């Protein structure tokens, strides 16, 4: 299965199965999971990057334990809408995951400012110190990314006259 656009991705997800969202960084991959109604995203885990095969095995294990049916990968677009090096890296992650599990639907979601927004919330609303922020910001950013994709999927379903 190729990487899908968000509408194709939404159509490919079976009813009542969650999906995961990823916020890949240089040292970690934040992981979030949706509920089975694809309404709410929640932080799930933080994968400390080692070798790709080990990281992928950890991700697929998390997905299996939650019966997750698809993956949304954050795409850190530049503010002018262009793609930089990190976008290329995240797209490569998606392609590599598909090589290991070609049946899993994968899509990308524009994650501009997701980490900055989560960091701001943690500081301003929750007064979280720097050490604790470092522990949670990536998985919370993954939830932010996944929530955005879920809301777009809901909008697509509503526009098509389908319940979601």
UniProtKB/Swiss-Prot annotation:
Keywords on record: Cytoplasm, Hydrolase, Nuclease, Ribosome biogenesis
Xref: InterPro entries: RNaseH-like_sf, YqgF, YqgF/RNaseH-like_dom, YqgF/RNaseH-like_dom_sf
An individual GO BP term: rRNA 5'-end processing
Highest taxon of the lineage: Bacteria
Example of a GO cellular component annotation carried by this entry: cytosol
Subcellular location(s) per record: Cytoplasm
Enzyme class, UniProt record, top EC level: hydrolase
GO molecular function: nuclease activity
Keyword DNA-binding: no
Enzyme Commission number(s) of this protein: 3.1.-.-
Keyword Nuclease annotated: yes
Cross-referenced SMART domains: YqgFc (SM00732)
Stated family: Belongs to the YqgF nuclease family.
Cited function: Could be a nuclease involved in processing of the 5'-end of pre-16S rRNA.
PANTHER family: POLYNUCLEOTIDYL TRANSFERASE, RIBONUCLEASE H-LIKE SUPERFAMILY PROTEIN (PTHR33317:SF4)
Protein name (record): Putative pre-16S rRNA nuclease
């Amino acid at each position: 299965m190729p990487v899908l656009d968000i509408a194709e991705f939404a159509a490919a997800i079976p009813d009542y199965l969650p999906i995961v969202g990823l916020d890949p960084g240089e040292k970690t991959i934040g992981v979030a999971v949706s509920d089975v109604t694809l309404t709410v995203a929640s932080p799930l885990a933080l994968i400390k990057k080692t070798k790709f095969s080990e990281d992928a095995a950890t991700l697929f294990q998390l997905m299996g334990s939650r019966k997750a049916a698809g993956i949304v990968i954050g795409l850190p677009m530049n503010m002018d809408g262009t793609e930089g090096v990190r976008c290329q890296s995240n797209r490569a992650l998606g392609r590599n995951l598909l090589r290991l599990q070609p049946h899993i639907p994968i899509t990308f979601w524009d994650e501009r400012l997701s980490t900055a927004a989560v960091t701001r919330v943690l500081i301003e609303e929750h007064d979280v110190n720097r050490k604790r922020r470092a522990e949670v910001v990536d998985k919370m950013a993954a939830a932010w990314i996944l929530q955005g994709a879920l809301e777009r999927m809901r909008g697509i379903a509503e526009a098509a006259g389908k319940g979601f």
